[in-house]
Amino acid sequence: MALLAEHLLRPLPADKQIETGPFLEAVSHLPPFFDCLGSPVFTPIKADISGNITKIKAVYDTNPTKFRTLQNILEVEKEMYGAEWPKVGATLALMWLKRGLRFIQVFLQSICDGERDENHPNLIRVNATKAYEMALKKYHGWIVQKIFQAALYAAPYKSDFLKALSKGQNVTEEECLEKVRLFLVNYTATIDVIYEMYTRMNAELNYKV
């Protein structure tokens, strides 16, 4: 769990404004999460998350004051790009980033909730499938869906996944899951607010890749 516990997201302020700098710093440590899943087929999600973080940071770095919060980014780009928005810039990058982050959230929450295949309780295929279907599947075309279905069957045993997540530390499964639950508190709240922001600003796009 060391992988997640070292970089907790900040608690949300009362106004639910997410500061861009600290957010990008925290999520920039998440791509190695996909290495814990073992299969190289998860590499595209890892690369997508890394690439979108880089795109958002490039915009943020041009004017950290103007782009202080994630909402600032959407508001400024909406005015800047006009009819092209939200299909451009950091707005588009954050739209895809939140989906990758949601995959991680649903996957970890499903494991913490004890959801499993009773016939194969040490497999995490059920958890990974739920996360993919909730976060990413509807944005993927048929070919990409087939690739990920293959990846889900290559997912590691839960015990091996939790060991990788703990960076080999000698901790019990319950200790690891307790730290995952702690990580999920601010992480889930933050992702929920980003989704709400996209809905409120009518910035969500449903095209497939």
UniProtKB/Swiss-Prot annotation:
Sequence repeats lie at residues 45-55, 56-66. It is found in: Cytoplasm. Beta-D-galactosyl-(1->4)-beta-D-glucosyl-(1<->1)-N-[(9Z)-octadecenoyl]-sphing-4-enine binds at residues 48-55, 140, 207. The modification N-acetylalanine is found at residue 2. Its main location: cytoplasm. Residues 45-66 are annotated as: 2 X 12 AA approximate tandem repeats. One of its GO terms (biological process) is intermembrane lipid transfer. Transmembrane segments: none annotated. A ganglioside GM3 (d18:1(4E)) binds at residues 48, 52, 140, 207. InterPro entries: GLTP_sf, Glycolipid_transfer_prot_dom. It holds the Pfam family GLTP. This is Glycolipid transfer protein.
